[in-house]
């Protein structure tokens, strides 16, 4: 009996111990699962850094209670290369870093100065004012200042001469020159070629200069017109002009169709000068950002106008966060001035947004550290290595990819003369061949005429050319008729 009770007691004790062990293991596994990825625990002999950052898409974002984004991936790569552990904290006041009215620094710069953080890994612009109080590494991203707009608010209305837009001014000028040159060549070749004159009594040529102009214009509209060329040389020029006009019309129709289907690319606001001259849109930037101080310190008259506008209306046009700025652009007549690289992402993810072409104030995003920090040099070298190996480009493509980019049309632009250079060259070769053929035809007739009237071929050729180019009428007597008259 005692042995039986002792056996039962041992079994129960073993079961309880196993259950407690399994529960402890489950709790440890749960702890491992909820451990956020912004915390890399201290390891043996590894220094630990406190990293301050700011929530901004796609640099740092919250996903399922964890931080992710471009800067988080960059931080992981740097920690792996330099062998340090880190703890990420979001900046308390939600600001990047500027001097407050009291003379103290706010944002991430202030946290580094107060030693609340060791480094700042964020889209933090390298400026001279910040460089005076903290140190920056080599920039990991290059950017500038651009204008973010909503397409519907700045689409340019079609002008009265919108039909001329498919070709640039230079192309239209080249086309007009090609038309006039071709008609002149038609007229001259028809005069020089004996086959284009009606014989035997009175030679008559239907290719007057006006008829040549009409013939060229008819080809531009794909319409057959009279007179019809008879000489081989004239037909060469006519054929090459027809081919030229067919290819030209195809290019015009294709580009005009692209123009009509991508009218949103024709922006009324292309530059900051356009922005300050218009009155339809309000514009502003992030309060306390480096962009605001760029315009404040600039000596450029246009930049000063931008700053004065924002300073007078700072309570209304300056925004607190980047997300607020994008939302305001989408919902109201508002243009946001900020980092061009962030605007590219907004335009990629919101297909009704677009960035104006002009970008000013080239700058870079760097990692901020305390002055005289030993980590500044190490982090700079690591950033350069990541750039050389293409890892920074990989991160850029990873976090800036968007379906909107694949759907967007290619930017439209008028056709330049360079795009049609081969076409104009082909026309020039055809005109040259036509003139050469006319000279050959005239020389053949001169050779036959020289045998009948006992003169040299060169003299007959010269007389014929001068006669055909001098006569004002479109009819002339043949050599036989003129010879009888002289007799």
Curated annotation (Swiss-Prot):
GO terms for cellular component: AMPA glutamate receptor complex; dendritic spine; plasma membrane; postsynaptic density membrane. One of its GO terms (molecular function) is AMPA glutamate receptor activity. Residues 1-23 form the signal peptide. This is Probable glutamate receptor. It is a multi-pass membrane protein. It is found in: Cell membrane; Postsynaptic cell membrane. Residues 24-169, 257-419 are extracellular. The chain crosses the membrane at residues 170-190, 236-256, 420-440. It comes from Gallus gallus. SMART domains: Lig_chan-Glu_bd, PBPe. Glycans are attached at residue 104. Pfam families: Lig_chan, Lig_chan-Glu_bd. Belongs to the glutamate-gated ion channel (TC 1.A.10.1) family.
């Amino acid at each position: 009996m005692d042995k039986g009770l002792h056996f039962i007691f041992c079994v129960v004790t073993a079961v309880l111990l196993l259950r407690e062990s399994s529960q402890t293991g489950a709790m440890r596994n749960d702890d491992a699962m909820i451990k956020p990825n912004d915390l890399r625990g201290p390891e043996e002999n590894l220094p630990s850094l406190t990293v301050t950052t700011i929530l901004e898409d796609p640099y740092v974002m919250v996903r399922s209670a964890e931080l992710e984004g471009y800067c988080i991936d960059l931080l992981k790569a740097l920690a792996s290369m330099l062998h340090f552990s880190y703890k990420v904290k979001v900046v308390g006041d939600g600001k990047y870093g500027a001097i407050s009215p009291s003379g103290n620094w706010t944002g991430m710069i202030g946290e580094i100065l107060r030693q609340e953080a060791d480094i700042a890994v964020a889209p933090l612009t390298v400026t001279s004012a910040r460089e005076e109080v903290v140190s920056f590494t080599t920039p990991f991203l290059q950017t500038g200042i651009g204008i973010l707009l909503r397409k519907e608010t700045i689409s340019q209305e079609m002008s009265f001469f919108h039909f001329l837009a498919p070709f640039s001014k230079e192309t239209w000028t080249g086309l007009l020159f090609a038309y006039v040159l071709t008609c002149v060549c038609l007229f001259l070749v028809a005069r020089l070629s004996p086959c284009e004159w009606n014989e035997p009594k009175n030679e008559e040529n239907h290719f007057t200069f006006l008829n040549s102009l009409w013939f060229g214009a008819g080809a531009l509209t794909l319409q057959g017109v009279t007179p019809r060329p008879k000489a081989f040389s004239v037909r060469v020029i006519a054929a090459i002009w027809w081919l030229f006009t067919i290819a030209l019309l195809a290019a015009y129709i294709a580009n005009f169709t692209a123009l009509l289907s991508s009218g949103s690319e024709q922006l009324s606001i292309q530059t900051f000068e356009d922005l300050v001259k218009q009155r339809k849109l309000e514009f502003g930037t992030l309060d306390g950002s480096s962009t605001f101080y760029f315009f404040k310190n600039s000596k450029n008259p246009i930049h000063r106008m931008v700053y004065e506008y924002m300073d007078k209306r700072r309570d209304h046009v300056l925004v607190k966060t980047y997300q607020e700025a994008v939302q305001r652009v989408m919902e109201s007549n508002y243009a946001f001035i900020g980092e061009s690289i962030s605007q590219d992402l907004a335009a990629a993810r919101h297909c009704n947004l677009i960035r104006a072409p002009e970008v000013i104030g080239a700058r870079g995003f760097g990692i901020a550290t305390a002055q005289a920090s030993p980590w500044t040099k190490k982090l700079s070298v690591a950033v350069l290595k990541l750039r050389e190996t293409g890892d920074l480009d990989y991160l850029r493509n990873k976090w800036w990819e968007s379906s909107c980019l694949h759907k967007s049309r290619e930017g439209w632009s008028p056709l330049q003369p360079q795009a049609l250079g081969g076409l104009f060259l082909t026309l020039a070769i055809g005109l040259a061949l036509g003139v050469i053929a006319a000279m050959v035809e005239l020389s053949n007739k001169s050779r036959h005429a020289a045998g009948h009237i006992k003169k040299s071929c060169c003299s007959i050729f010269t007389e014929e050319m001068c006669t055909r180019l001098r006569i004002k009428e479109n009819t002339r007597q043949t050599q036989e008729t003129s010879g009888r008259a002289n007799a």
